[in-house]
Amino acid sequence: MFCVQCEQTIRTPAGNGCSYAQGMCGKTAETSDLQDLLIAALQGLSAWAVKAREYGIINHDVDNFAPRAFFSTLTNVNFDSPRIVGYAREAIALREALKAQCLSVDANAHCDNPMADLQLVSDDLGELQRQAAEFTPNKDKAAIGENILGLRLLCLYGLKGAAAYMEHAHVLGQYDNDIYAQYHKIMAWLGTWPADMNALLECAMEIGQMNFKVMSILDAGETTKYGHPTPTQVNVKATEGKCILISGHDLKDLYNLLEQTEGTGVNVYTHGEMLPAHGYPELRKFKHLVGNYGSGWQNQQVEFARFPGPIVMTSNCIIDPTVGSYDDRIWTRSIVGWPGVSHLEGDDFGPVIAQAQQMAGFPYSEIPHLITVGFGRQTLLGTADTLIDLVSREKLRHIFLVGGCDGARGERNYFTDFATSVPDDCLILTLACGKYRFNKLEFGDIEGLPRLVDAGQCNDAYSAIILAVTLAEKLGCGVNDLPLSLVLSWFEQKAIVILLTLLSLGVKNIVTGPTAPGFFTPDLLAILNEKFGLRSVTTVEEDMKQLLSA
């Protein structure tokens, strides 16, 4: 096992990465190794997808499957070894079908990629795990060095984050052939074990630029189906009655659940990154969507244990449900998996609803505590002139984007302390689950404009980018000249690709933490600092002083 993709990875003087029987996330060595094997199979599939496009062949089954299967290897998504192997087998079957299509056009069709003809050696998980050793990401570290390995992983993990957003967009009916062609090209190239530093740096920026397009179609999918988010108050306390909790990012799953629970007497609560759903008109119209439950994903083993109903995980993040003894009432959807947990293959939530009706639910309603969400792209753009007016009248000094992933590390209190230290004449724009560090606090307003503005899920960084570009255009300056600072927390691969997206768009002087990714070497950090001004957090006082004086 070697895995260094998330922020909680093991760090020692000898090197970074989880390399024992189990990773810090709870992923076993077996599952981790089989995920490496799956990635190799997906690289071979992408290699043939690139070749097929040379012949004018676009196989939508391949395009739909590849990012989804890659998403299953993201942190805290799928811990179920047999399902990972199932994805690998499906990848190879699709590859062979695509290969046959190519050969029907050109009998000499050939794909020159190390992964192009990969076959699984056995049905036995132990044998497959031994085969997976050929594809361990750091297998040639001694030959290529830490810097090249770090750049490879930056590209692989960044592309993995983009694949997750591609799957979210696909679920909502969005497709862009150029994006998929670019995805397959990059995925196939990474399967050649590239070792050119400049080429890898260019690839990282290409992934960021591609992801900007992905976030654009995801935004289109969400707003076309569910309307543009508008500011909405959400209760974060319990309401009397039977209940279901839904977590993750999949708004379509939430919509289906709301439709199927309507009139059943079962209330629905959002959790984690599903909180922004309350801002969408077509979702909040359901009166039994009564609130949001819990805090950051890392607290779920305590909070889920206390929730008196079933729980549905639609995407990341799931952690060991046996710890809180709620494994008999947590359900996984789509690419999510945990051994022994009930999995929903389709869109029928009937078994979940039946379980909710058999459980006690909340015995009484607590005193409501309301927070505000729903500052989506359209709403944010509607504030642009107000923001400019406040700045011109010196009522608004600075905007801080404080957001990103949450996690268990104690150093993440930095982001709570930073938000509460922001001066009263400054605004906080937030997104993703990092907001749970401070989103239940009171920040007041500036002439009626809330000082805490919740833009949505992690992918809604797109909305923040569009706002920044719009402000810069209206003010006749560059984005980096705005009174705007980005203070980002990271945990997993979606955050990595958001960072690459920002860097590829030329956004500079981003402050990130609580620690640097374990695959970043001192040399790579120095390169990113020199090119983009990217740096790690220090202390709240020092960072605040520096950002306000920039």
UniProtKB/Swiss-Prot annotation:
Pfam family, one: Prismane
Modified-residue entries (Cysteine persulfide), positions: C405
Major subcellular site: cytoplasm
Residues bound to [2Fe-2S] cluster: C3, C6, C18, C25
Example of a GO biological process term: response to hydrogen peroxide
Annotated compartments: Cytoplasm
InterPro entries, A to Z: HCP/CODH, Hydroxylam_reduct, Prismane-like_a/b-sand, Prismane-like_sf, Prismane_a-bundle
Binding of hybrid [4Fe-2O-2S] cluster, residues: H249, E273, C317, C405, C433, C458, E492, K494
NCBIfam families: hybrid_clust, PRK05290.1
UniProt-recorded name of the protein: Hydroxylamine reductase
Organism: Salmonella dublin (strain CT_02021853)
Gene from which the chain derives: hcp
